[in-house]
């Protein structure tokens, strides 16, 4: 039996009862020359990575088992279970992206298939095919990404209630900046779950203390008088299906177009989904020379490694003496809400609204943060199962940095939740996080992260 899938992120599973002199299981099948999956004779599981590459594992379940394949954009997790509750992964992150007509000819799809081999018979039951993109009802935890000034790396923390966050890996980096960035350090990490269920993480390629750490001989990458504080020319893009294994691309603006050879900064990149264009939209702070910062946007491909359009102006602050930076765009209902930082009279957070992701945006004159000192890096996130939104921002205007939080249900009235460890929001094992972002994740995703980053006591 073959089934043609209609989703990029789906789960297919079936209960298999293997008879005598029989080997049966579940495959993703393109042709006789291209397939992947798992079969069993009741004694061993044989996992096919492709037609010519396979391995075996002991079958401790027996002749009756449930086989499951989770296809996440041609990235497979193949598992088996006795009861459909506890699953044993046999292989994870199996790439089947080359199982298509360009490689194997024909114009077929990679389809779920039930397979039975040998003289004996098999019984298949309870076949399942379903879209695997989690909805809010499936969420059970929160994931925060941020950077710390001492490490210039990606850090992660998890909360199960949206109030108390515990850093993974004992607050050490989960992705070291010097392994992914041209400047050997990153800032401003942002994470976004796309409509395909994948995770898209972007960050500034910039080490503010690169000279001190021995990564360069000058204070900045280029002349500060000509290009300004913290000058850089690129960003880092990373994509993952499981929050552990990440693809990685250094996007350098001068390589995108010669028009950006003199770009002075590319800061705080974030990603959203443009529902009208049906594309991932990357937006960021940028300026040339010593001009004021403006917000720009461009569309990025699904692989998250190439711009599909040149950057265009998203927002220029109307006061010619002030700039707009650090945008955070979230679609709520029919409106795109853009929180951003400006320095018009004070340095804090304002809001602009639009019917479209790429604008135009209508500004208002209200300040939203409650910080008595300068803040930046706004990030908006929703409490699971509640009509409550939390605006988090980076309070950098004091010696010891911290995150501030305000909460709203209508974006008119806001409740001040204070800062980490100075109110209801708690940071268990870390301090002084910088420019972060929070998303909802499932219990399975949270537990996978905790298991992967657990440290020995």
Q: Model-predicted segments: where are they?
A:
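Entry beta-strands of beta-propeller and related beta-repeat scaffolds
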Residues: 138-143, 197-201, 277-282, 335-337, ...
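Loop/turn-rich, solvent-exposed surfaces of beta-rich toroidal or solenoidal domains
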Residues: 344-351, 355-361, 368-404
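Extracellular glycan-recognition regions
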Residues: 1-138, 438, 455-456
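Surface loop/turn signatures of beta-propeller and other carbohydrate-active proteins
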Residues: 55-60, 89-111, 133-139, 146-147, ...
